[in-house]
């Protein structure tokens, strides 16, 4: 079994997918405090823009909306986000067609759940986030989301 350690960026994740997609039973994680299974080989993934671009090009050819969905999955605040995205990508590559409507498949269900949690939290914060004026006249809104949603809600406030 191989464990692919990424740096947490989407480009590094897609670089890991280049090898991990065909490596059944592997684990992709950015966690440095990950409990390594007995006998597992650790592979430190270094971002390779060529491999990352090839994976993204293949995904766009299969399903144009898959890149956005995977981007939302990778914004999830849980440790399993890379594995959820990897299983979704494996299913896309296996079927060679969009799979978002295969709601009985566990990988699709898990991916849709992750997407729903990220987009739902972003929607909630656009409605409930309140700004305060600082001493120097700058407005700010302290908040602590469960997921990485700042880039998703920013256009709403500009």
Listing of model-derived features with the role each one plays in the protein:
Residues 2-3, 30-32, 47, 51, ...:
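Extended, charged helical/alpha-beta scaffold domains that provide interaction surfaces
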Residues 1-49:
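N-terminal ordered "arm"
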Residues 21-24, 58, 62:
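Generic N-terminal helix/loop capping motif
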